[in-house]
Amino acid sequence: HMMIYANRRHSYKDLPIRIGEIAHDFRYESSGTLKGIERGRHFCQNDAHLFVTPEQIEDEFSKVVDLIFSTYKDFGITDYRCVLSLRDPENKVKYHDDDEMWNTAEDALRKVLNDLGIEYTEEIGEAAFYGPKLDVNVKPAVGNEYTLSTCQLDFCLPAKFQLTYIDKDGEKKTPVVLHRAILGSLDRFMAYILEETKGNLPTWLAPVQVKVMPVKTDNEELMAYAHKVVDALDAKNVRVELDDRAEKLGYRMREGQVEKVPYLLVLGFNEVENNTVSYRLHGQALSLIHI
């Protein structure tokens, strides 16, 4: 992303510039730390870098924080801990050597969190080498706390890559970069969601939202009605599957429950006659609706 930014000239009027992607990352983690999709050597990350002027830091960081928590609201995540990771002033050899930069960066992040009324803890010595960061940590049902989301403030790398923009006075200035990962590693994020929901994903997130099950799969009338229902749902962008296997209905229903499909639709002759479907919401009894 640094090289993409450096590929052309930029004015202060262009900033902020936001460059993001879903990236495949590789990291040689020690074998003892590997843990399924929660921590692997290959993972996917929703990675973004935001190029801003110093005056835009607080506003852009505030937008990142809002995006993190609006995303958590969508997924029903309420149990998390915000950590402002700072450098250790007693061990400066670990960090980019610029006291003024560090003080400015840490004060900017701290001010935004205070202005937004967000509770957080400060952890000395946990910053990246190039700047302070906000980590949002969760505690899974099993195992240690880990970071889901992060936003890191970076004054260092833009200078090393010789990135510039032209300010309002026509002078070359170095932008500031915010490293942003809203969901962090997608693999780890899904591991957390699956663990928290025990696989009972909300309907909007379930890979298959509805399974349609005719009582008899060898009856033309029932199968025609089943295809009609599937087509109607598919037209509404519902992720629907037709289970037309030559198995007993009870067996297919049990499999649908084990797969944790949110809605199982059962179609019999009464449903065909009355233009209705019987449905079972995962974990509940059958109900009837008209279509």
Model-predicted segments: where are they?
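NTP/phosphate- and nucleic-acid-binding module
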Residues: 1-288
